[in-house]
Amino acid sequence: MNTRVLRLTTTRPPAIERRVVQTSMLSLVLLVAAWCSISIGAAKSDLLFPIKLIGEWIASGQNQSSIMMIVSEIRLPRVILAILIGAALAVSGASLQGVCRNPLADPGLLGISSGAAVGAVTVIIFANSLSVPQFIQPYLIPIAAFVGAAITTFTIYRLAQVNGTVQIATLLLAGVAINAMGGAIIGAFSYVADDQSLRLMTFWMMGSLASATWFMVAISAPVLILGMYFIHKKRTEINLLLLGEANARYVGVDVDRVKHHLLWLNAIVVGVAVACSGIIGFIGLVVPHILRVST
């Protein structure tokens, strides 16, 4: 009996080539979005602003016109910080989905963002009664948000430990409980806040990059970049955790140590991101799924 083997050919490029093409396209989209964000605004809209800005820097070494000051001192820090925070939240969401083996896991689900919000709202409510040095006051809310995220992560981690092992189900339940508790605390603060504090609370919790400065970029960029780098170094362990903790241990992964490191790396990254921009949801949940579908 003769059997025929049909070989199906496809024009689909190899995986590496396809990934290069997709990365190039996404980078181009990011570049176009950043270019438009720098060029378009309430003061004046001109798609040639970045070119003019570079030309003026080269010619005089400083920004002469007011519109150039707006571009270089307001729009550019916001764009850079938006890119860093978006990337950090996406990387954090992808790693938490791997650690928890839950496609719906994100920093908000585990209560990290809620803890940061409680810290920031606490400072907003009691700002008038706090005596702090003048130079720290502009950064008091970001510092409180980061501390709140760190305390929340420590609490969730301790609650999730059973006999020295972090249980994923307990971790998720503790995160949901802390998230609900944080919402209740914020609601109570909203009830006792005056009009000015209530407006500031609402504005901060909506998420905004209006307070972005070069100083904030200089402080947050190294932390976010290093945090994303160390999370990316754990990509092999995260992929193995997706197969199950037993299988990961079978191939030599120290599961408890990896989960410990990833939880604290995510706490640092998300804490800094939320401290700079307020609560920005949806990115950490959806972006990893979009990239998985596209690749």
Residue ranges and their predicted role:
Residues 2-295:
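Alpha-helical transmembrane segments in inner-membrane proteins
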